Amino acid sequence: MFVAVAAVVGLWLFERERRRSGLPNHTLDAGMAGVFGGLAGAKVVWAIEHMGREGPFFDLLISRGGLSWFGGFAGGLVAGLLVMRHHRLPILRVLAAATPALAIAHAIGRVGCFLVGDDYGVPSDLPWAVAFPGGLPPTTSPVHPTQLYEML
């Protein structure tokens, strides 16, 4: 759910910045391609990272869980660049317009990771350490909330 919220908010912010920057209407095509390419890249890289340990590659591709941030960034960038090139858009100006939206969308995604107890850090005795007994994977030991660190 947070992935969808992040995508909608990110595209909305990108569209606002696109208008402010005077970029053409079809610049949003690059943003949409970035979202779909990002989802595909995130799933493929996660499946590659976990195949063998958690199951065969193709089973992991169609599983409910698992996305890799780096795969999402790479897939989104490649897809967005292909659309920018196809439409002959000014790549650096489009990337500059997309950057704030990407940062906000990433922060929204990290809130989702925190709420489900995913991607946490190493054990810690600091006052803000958090336990995720229902997390993915669960931990009853207090750990660094790296999702929130990354959000900042």
State what each model feature region is:
Residues M1-L152:
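A feature for loop-to-transmembrane-helix boundaries and adjacent hydrophobic helices
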